[in-house]
Every structure is written in structure tokens, then in C-alpha cells.
């Protein structure tokens, strides 16, 4: 964009400090024939002076322009030297003739009668840089040369690479125009502004000082005053401001509309609808024209595409053809064709021979009246077709005024020169003209097509106005001193935000020089000419259309082939700068001033449309939040080459889904075969399938990581790719992956085949043998034998594997971008505040647990006596009816509040009635279908393992539900026992199956619960209904529905032993693992810290001393199987929220614990709607569908158990129970052995066998805990009162909850 006559080019490829140390270019002696002669000091002498000057100037200017051309089309040190020689010669010539003009005519030239002569002498007497002494002149030339060189040779290289580097044109220009990747655009933008701008700042400071020094000697206050003098108007600045104010409303409406479109594309993170637009998103390096993002903002996308770039390419257009088409437009107006020298000498494409060139498009006048050229790295695009006409406009101007004196071979003002080609481009870009030249199939002139066209033009013309206005506002401030070097960048961005409403996309400071990243600043080309030209061209267009006889909307006018219009234009061009521009303009348009009305008239239809659209959308015009800046993208700049193409992403997701169904099905089959028949062969096959699925995960995860998910718009595709990007264990190198898989298999196998043997040789497995012992025995020593034996066999054996497992799972997590494995597991909840939220929920439920704990401890004290139970201490962990003391329902007979009330144990009735495991699952299936949910398919009954095999096979008995990823095969594996507890478990597992069936049509990656807790909660929600006396009565398992207060308390106690007792255990398991993963628990302290947490949260202690050789966490299935556990805590909370919401949907009234949703289609529909979502939406949305609000809350659980809490509080107060365990360091064997162990030098402390130093540290730690517990206990009664008080006045928001039969996810 710009005429280039007499412009300075780049120079030596040396840094400025080094360049300034080189010897200056020697001053060349001016040929005596070019020196001024003797002339009389009057007007007649001045006429002779001007004629002599003209003939000499043509020679000097030809040499100077030829040297600049040679350099700009081949940037070498030699060409830079020759260019500087020519510059010095030009300056010496200017000095000689300028000084002579001042000497002869200074007092009288403004009084000459010939106005053209006055203009010539006035131009000659202005020496500019020739005023400087030789040394400063040489420094000035070197500065110009170096600034141009830095700009023209700047490159942006990919991070950590040198092979791929981009130049501005065409590389970075193409990226800014075509990329829709936020990060890639940012990298290109930031890279260019740093590479081109930063090195220029010190040079620009020195240039400013020298330039001002030179022009002050010509009588100007500074360089800016000289530049403004070309417009010969004392009110020039005020006139421009008035014009801008007239045009600003149109810009503001365009800005708001485009900002909304960018918001649709980039979202809230990167676009603030009340703030400025990040500068790199508008399709252009300087956000000066926005037509490259037309595809993102097109008002009516179904209308014909007005960007004809693709058609040009299809038709084989090249650069030369584009210039021939432009020439033909000019000649159709009977203007001049290009001379032969134009076609012979121009550089119309970027050279392919490796030369460094100045790509910025420019038109050149060689001042010999025949040689005119264009230098442009032309690309075949519609945008460049407009640029071609623009540059041809300059050439046409040169051709028309070539016979004027050299000093008058300029535009009437600089804006005139820029406007001519653009006037023709206004015709060329009309759909009618594009149709005429074969680039549009048809012309559609309906309103919608008009709006499309005008918006496209507005993106070029209106978007440019504030930038065209502000560049020289900034430079005038620099030249005047209002903007010192210490504020170059601050003031630049102040103006860009003030006028353009854009902001830098990355932090900028005064080390940056972002103005220097725009060609015209380092190349010292004034810019206000473009603002002027954008107003003038519409005045010209209106006048020429009228001359051509056109009637109709101004934006549809095409002056092609109008010789009348051509004649009118020719008259303007031929005048050059021989007359005041106001006169030339008046001859052309009938008005002698710049006028915005033709521009406003041209855009009036789209102005009105934009106003209506913005009002409908409630847009804020302007940017009141002007200080807002966007955040940096994640993984910037490493992630800049990520793919953002939606179609490519969609194709990838389809392929991933198709292949995943096959691979996951094969893996599930192998895993099932191993779990139902543990042999060397099945484990070998499973390891193979493990590697196969890891390879699949690695392959597609690696491909997925090539996508920038933040830039994708389709939320489903975005969610899938983000999930697939997490390679999990497959991120490990092959050898480590193989080791990891083997460790997992070894740990799980060790756990599954472990047995505990009596001295007589009979051995018991966990399921069902040891489980039965723990559930039914009331003998302290028998329970201790089973408890300790299981941990000796399972836990200790797993310890050898666990440290390496931790190392490898952490390594995998870090390779996936997480801090550690705990961070990875927590990410599944998509909740930054997860840990704080869970702690809050636990604190809300703790009073209920403490009261249950105290009550149960009293009952155990009655049974086992003071030797084994301390009423102020923790409970021995083996006495609670379960191997891990996680649920206490098996000791219901010891704690039943009202033993004389009717029994709720249905086991006897089930056995009498001949219930089988299959019948239990049939009843569960019936419950789901009664809600209008799906029945299980035939494959379920044919392939599930519902009982422990009797053929001697080793199996994994832990109950689990399985999805085989083919949409029809779903199974349960459970060593079912006919009792009420396993009936509840059957409903839990069937809940997983129902979830699988509901989301089976989703892509594989989304076939999961909304969060892991959701999957656990679904079956438990139904189990809450199944467990009610009412429902059990309907199954003929209870003789009555109950209904008395005593019956209710018994029922709630039984439920609390399941649900409330489980809360602290489900909370602490992953508290321990997260700390193991983050390193705060080391392998030396695995067991000690495990028991610290079990004491802190559960109020339990080991019944026998534990050592660090023990590994009691490993005696819990989920630890060796690497299954996250916090999901169960979550599920126990949310199942009560679901239950409350579904009871409301079913129309239930009355206490929540009596609700049975059986046969409620309304409840089923609400549940199905949420399950169908799978993992396709964030879990709060699924929560909203079920409960009407998006948060986890303990209120429903508290509401459910409120009658029991009231009863427990009364009972505990009656017996003077101490809530908590203030004697926290008591253990069952402490009366016998608290202190040094015989002959060992070791200490039994807190049930642990420790050395003395460890025990001392532990005592201090527990002293602190004791004080904290004491404070907590003192405040408890007030807390209980507060909870009770709130429950009477607060509407329940609905909770969630579930029974712990943990899902074994493949």
C-alpha cells in the first residue's frame, strides 16, 4: 500500500552499533553539470532556475530510485552500499539547489505571480535531511537503511526449532488470514511484533532526533509539522477529527457485531463482550482490515460466496493476469496502458531464487517519464486483486502527470495518490463486475446478498478507518515530544484501544516497540494519507458514477468502460500537485473539502442492518471494560501447531470411535475371562490385550494431542478429544508400560488368590469364607485371627509391588500433564474446588457419624467388655462386622435399638422361599422396568457370573458390572449369597448395567457416568427404595410394613450402619493415596499414615500392633487394583439427593426414609434423561436434570437420617457418652503392652510396633490431635443444636447416596 517514488530502502545486514562504528560512506562529489548555475534574483530568474533544476533533478532522482529498487529487490550489503551512495548524492544535490533557492528567492518567492513557480520553489527550498551536516547525514541514511533491513528480513521461528522460520510475506500474512487457531495466531502475532519491533526502538529514537533537527532548519516545529504541511490547511487536524467523529458510529456497530461473532468462535475465555478485541484475531497482522475473517461473520452464509479467491485459483489466474485485468479496467476508461518498461522491469511475484526482498507492495516512478514499476509479492486472492488495482492507480497517476516539472509530480495531496486505484477497486469488487470478468456465476441483488457484500466491504473500508487515523496521531506525538521513548509502546496501545477497541493479546511493555512492526513506521512513510484516501475515494466514486450516468445504490455502481468517467478522472490525475488540492477536488466532486457523506451513503443499508442486529443481541457499543486483556492459552507456545479444523476433528473422532469399539470389546472379553478363571494362560492373554489397548490408546491419544481442543466449537467433539488426549498408562515408554501392567496384574492376582490357613491346614478365602467370619462371628479372637491373617497374607504380599506402582503411575500422570496421579484422578470431576467441597460435605456429616460411633461403641462395650472396648477411645477395627470396618450392618444384632420390634432381616425368608442369585437379579431388573427403564438383554442372563463357580476355578469375587462396548453385551460378576445385603448389592450392580444401556448409543469415549460417583449412585438409589419395609413387604419378605417409631428407628439404624458408617472410610482411602502420590507419605510411613487417617476419620485402631512391614491398605481391593475410591464417598452423598428428587417426582409425601419409587414412570423418566447424557456434559448439568440444581449437598442425607440423629443424641446424652475418641492412643493391647516390647528396644504405640524415636514423634503429633479433638468435642453440642435448628427452617436441596459395592471398571 503506497507510492514509492524517492523512498528509502533497507541497508547493510549489520546491527546498528556495529554499523555506526564503520567508517562513513565517503561523500561523492556532485557532477559540475548538476550544480546550480547563476540566476537573477527575480521571478524571471526563478523560472530559469526551475527549468534547470528540473532537468538535473530527473537525472539524480533516476539514480536514487534505481539504487533503491536494486536494493529492495535484492537485499545485499553491496546494494545497500550503493543505495547509501545514491542517497548521499541526492542529499548533496538537494542541499546545493535548496541553499541556492534560499539565497536567491527567500525574501520574494511567496510573492511570485506564477502559482506553479511558487510551488516549485517552495519544494526545492525544503532541504529536509540535506540540512544535516555530512556526519549526521550519513548516520541518518544508515538509520533508514538499517530500519528497513530489520523490518524486511525479520523472521519468526517455531519454538525450539530453527528449521522452520516464517517471513512476513507470504508466511505470517497467510497464517493471520487463514488460521483460526488462537494459539497459532498469537504466536505469529507475538513473534512478528518481537522480531520486527524490538530491535527498531533505539534506531527510531535516533531517527526522530535527526529528522526533527533537519526539518526545524526548514522552519517547521518538527517532522510531523512538515508532513502536515503537504495538506496546506491550517485546520487539517481539526478537520480529520471531525471526519472521524462522523464515521465512528458505523465503526462501533461493526466492532460490536464482529466481536459477537468472534465470541461465538473463541468463547468467553478470549472474547469479552464489553471489552476490546484481542488484536491477533481479525485476519490481519495489524487488525487494519478484517476481510479475511469474512467467513466467520458473514450475515447470510447461504447466499453466493463473494470471496472469489477459489474461483481465481480454479481458473488458473496468476500474478501477471491479475495486473493485465487491472490494466484493462484503466484502458476501458480510455486511460493509459502500461508502457513496455512496466512489464519488463516490475517484480510482480516473490522471487523463487532465494533473494531477500522487500515484499511490501509499492509503485515506483523512475522520473524519466517512461519507466514505472510495481514491486509486489502477489498472491492469487481477491484481496490481492484489490491491491493490484490500488498499485496500478499509482502508476496511472505517474503516467498522467509525467510531463509536469519534477517538483509537481505528486498527488494533489498524498491522499489523492492512495485513492485513485481504490476508486477503481470499488467497481471491481461489485458482484456485477466480478460476473463480467468471469469470477461470479450469477449476480444476486436481493437484500441479503447486498448486506453480505456491504459487510465484506465494511470489513475492508470501515475497519481500517481508526487505524488509518491513529498511526500518525502516534507519530505526531513522537515527533512533538508528547510521546517520549519511555512511553512509545504505552501510547501506541492507548491509541489502538481508544480508536480501534483492540488490545494486545499478550503483555507488552516498553522493551517492545509494536509500532515498529508496521511497515510505514521503520520505512518512514506518512500514514494519514490512507485515512484521507478512504474518505476521498468515496467522494470520487460518487462523482464518477454520476458522470457515468449511473443511477441506483452507490455500492452497486461499476464505472467499467465509462469514457466519461475516465475523462473526469484524467483531469484530476494530470494536475498532479500543480494546483491546490481543494481546487482539484472541487473540479472533480463540486466540493472543496473532505466529506464523509458519500462513504456513509454507500454503507447506509449495512449501517441500519448492523444497528438492528446489535440492538436485538443487546450489544454494548464500545468497550467499557477497556482494561481487560485475554489470558494466555494453555501450553503456549508449545501448542501452536495444534489442529483446529472442525472437519478433521470430526473425522478423527469417528475413526477413534469405530476402532475403540473393537479394541475395547476384545479387552473386556480377555479381562472377563481372567476375572472368571484366574490362570497363567488367561493372565497372559489379558496382558497381551492390555498392551493392545495401550497401543490403541497411545496411537489415538497421540493423534488427539495434535488438536487444540480450546479452539474446537463442537462441544461433543471437543469433549471426546480432550478425553482421548489423556493417554493414562499408555503414555509410559514401552518397557515401563509392560512393567506397570505386570505389577497391576501381580497385585490383583495376589489379592484375589490370597488365603488364610488354620494350623490344621484348612484355608479360607476372602469370599465368602473370611467375609462370613467377619460378618457372623462374635468371638473376639476368631475375628482377630481372620482380620490379622488377611492382612498378613494379602497386605504384606502387595507391599513389595506398591512403591514401584506409585512411581510408574505418577510418571504416567506427569506425561499426561498432571502434577501426579492424584491430580489425574481428581480431574475426572472437572471441579477445581473438589477437595474443599468434599471436606465441607464431610464436616456436615461428621456429627451424625460421631453419634453413631459413640452408640455402637457402647453396644460393643456391652458385648466385649472393658478389656476390649474403651468408651473414650477408638474402636478395634475387627469388631464391626466387616473386614475393613467400612460398613457395620453385620453387627446390627448387637446394636439394634429395639430388639422386641419386628425383625427386618429378610435372609431367613429369602432362604425359606427358595430365592436364588438369579431370582435376586430378576427382582432388580423388575424394579428398573417398573420405572419405565430398560430390561437387561438376553446376553446378560446367558453370560453373567451371578454365583461363585463350584468347579474349582479361581475367580475375582469382588462384585462388578461390565460393559462390552458392542451395545448389547452387559454382564455382572458377583459371588452372590442369598441375603438382604447381597440383594442390595444386586440392585447396585444392576444400576451400572442400566447406566451402560442408557448411554450405549453415545461415542465410546462418552460411555461413562457424568462423574465416577454418578455411576456408583444409580443402583443405590433404587436400593434405598428396595430396603424400605414397605417394599420388602411387597416382595413377601417381611410380614408387615412396620410403621411404628421403634420400627422406624430400627430401620434407620440398619441403614446408618451401611451408609453413615461408610462415610469416613470412603473419604480417607483416597486422602491416603493422594498423599502417597504427592510424596507427603513415603513408603517408610505407608502403614503408620494409613492408621493415622483411620483413627482421625473413623475413630478406629488396629487390634494388634502393626509394623512398617505390614501394608494394611493393600488388604483393600481398590488399592492393589488401582481403582479410585472417592467416587464412593461422592456416590453416598448424591444418591440421597437423587432419592429425594425422585421421591418428589413420584409424588411421595412423608418422611424421606419411607419413600419407595417402585413403578413411578415419572421418577424413571427423570433418571433416564440424566443417564442418557453419559459423560457428554459436565456432571452439574446431569445433577440439574435430576435434582433441579447443580451442586452436591449433604442436606438430603441429613434429612433422611434426622429421626435417627435425634434419637441417637438423646441416647448418648442419657448414657453420658463422649463423642469422639479423646483417649486416641488407647489400643486393645495397651493395658498389657503399652511401652517397650520385651527385649526389642521397640515400643507399641497406637497399635504400631515402632522404635522409641518414632513413638516420641507420634506422641507429640497425637497430643496436638488430642487438643484439637477436645476443642471439637466441646463445640459439638452447639454444632448439633445448630444443625437441628437449621433443619427445622431450611428447605432441603436434595442429596445423593449409595451402598458400597464398588464398580470394577475395566
Curated annotation (Swiss-Prot):
The active site is at residues 391, 520, 989, 1118. The keyword Thylakoid does not apply. It is a single-pass type I membrane protein. Binds 2 Zn(2+) ions per subunit. Binds 3 chloride ions per subunit. The record marks 523, 1225 as: Not glycosylated. Residues 1278-1306 are cytoplasmic. Its EC number is 3.4.15.1. The chain crosses the membrane at residues 1257-1277. Monomer and homodimer; homodimerizes following binding to an inhibitor. Interacts with calmodulin (CALM1, CALM2 or CALM3); interaction takes place in the cytoplasmic region and regulates phosphorylation and proteolytic cleavage. This is Angiotensin-converting enzyme. It comes from Homo sapiens (Human). The lineage of its organism: Eukaryota, Metazoa, Chordata, Craniata, Vertebrata. The gene is ACE.
